[in-house]
């Protein structure tokens, strides 16, 4: 008999459902949940990169996994400011995950971040390093 697949999107689970229980019975946060916790600390008007979040979590080579986490961030509660996470040169590489088109850039501009041709103009000035500036 075939297994019936759930129609619920796994990314729509609340943050509390993202925790695992380890053998000792303690709750353990998932990688995605840790990413969301770091992203929530990004100050208004600042941005960081996927790689900077990965490095802050001690997984320097996991920038793509941070990107995957950001792809589903719009379904997480409390909210995650995914628009503040860009690639290592300030490119809005995740912009196609925002609806309607242009929403990521609009949110950044609203926070005083200049964007030209999908790249943050003042990236070095606006960059927030969670490894050294974590709130």
What does each of the following model-derived ranges do?
Residues 2-135:
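Nucleic acid-binding interface residues in structured DNA/RNA-binding domains
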């Amino acid at each position: 008999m075939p297994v019936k697949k759930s129609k619920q999107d796994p990314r729509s689970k609340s943050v509390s459902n993202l925790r695992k229980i380890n053998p000792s019975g303690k709750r353990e946060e998932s990688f995605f949940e840790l990413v969301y916790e770091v992203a929530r600390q990004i100050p208004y008007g600042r941005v960081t990169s996927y790689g900077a979040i990965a490095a802050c979590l001690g997984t320097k080579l996991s920038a793509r996994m941070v990107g995957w986490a950001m792809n589903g961030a719009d379904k997480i509660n409390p909210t995650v400011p995914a628009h503040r996470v860009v690639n290592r040169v300030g490119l809005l590489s995740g912009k196609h995950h925002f609806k309607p088109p242009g929403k990521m850039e609009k949110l950044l501009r609203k926070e005083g971040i200049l964007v030209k041709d999908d790249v943050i103009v003042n990236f070095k000035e606006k960059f927030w390093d969670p490894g050294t500036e974590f709130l």
